[in-house]
Amino acid sequence: MQPIAPCNRSAEEEGEAVAVSSRHPWPRTDHNGCVPTKKKPQVTAAAARRGELLSTAAEVFAEHGYNATTVRRIADHAGMLAGSLYYHFDSKESMLEEILRTFLDELWDGYDSVLASGLGPRETLEALVTESFREIDRHRAAVAIYQKESRHLVAQDRFAFLADSQRRFEKAWLSTLERGVAEHAFRADLDVRLTYRFVRDTVWVAASWYRPGGRHSPEEIARQYLSMVLDGIAVRE
């Protein structure tokens, strides 16, 4: 008995393929003698819609605050019924978690690349600041949520990853500043912890006023910011 091979079919014919019955383990053929194949699921459209809903939810959380935001409010902004939103997410907590995890994962991809590049302390500081402003450009609403809500969210087991990320932030920035002092790139009398807090807060607060697509790119804002900060902490020649 000759094996049955799939036939070459058009996209329209592929969509009409017949599923193999669980009661008949051998492949059944269609009227052309072809092995039927299942239509591939359209995952890209669903993923795109999910991304749109997360973007909408992030803007609502950032504007109204997490506690004051309901699933219905998010659904209203997305132009859909609240029940339809549950098709994509089981709760507003799951939406917020995904928003924050996506932001932090992308941020740490950039930070880890900078920290592994072997740059000097001044160049590392410049690169970390620039990467931070790029993340504000990509995830402005998520940064605003992180700034306003993380202190309260870390008490929940679901958001314990925020505390872990904060510890990584502190270690990365403090080690860079301490290395700069040790290598005489930064002033010897620099209070590294105070400087870290100043830089951290003044960078992230930009999410409250920065709007993507404005007259200044994130790189330009980073250059302007660094010109002020580095004039204050760098060793004067």
Residue ranges and their predicted role:
Residues E52, T56, V60-S94, E98:
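Helix-turn-helix
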Residues E98, D112-A142, V192, Y196-V199:
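Hydrophobic alpha-helical connector segments
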Residues E63-N67, S117-G118, H139, E183:
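Short coil/turn segments at alpha/beta junctions that flank glycine-rich nucleotide-binding fingerprints
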Residues T124, D137-D157, S208:
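Amphipathic alpha-helical segments used for helix-helix packing
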Residues R134-R138, I145, S175, R179, ...:
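Amphipathic C-terminal alpha-helical segment
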Residues D105-D112, R138, Q156-E183, R193-R197, ...:
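Amphipathic alpha-helical packing segments from all-alpha helical-bundle domains
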Residues A47, G51, S55, E59, ...:
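Generic detection of well-ordered alpha-helical segments
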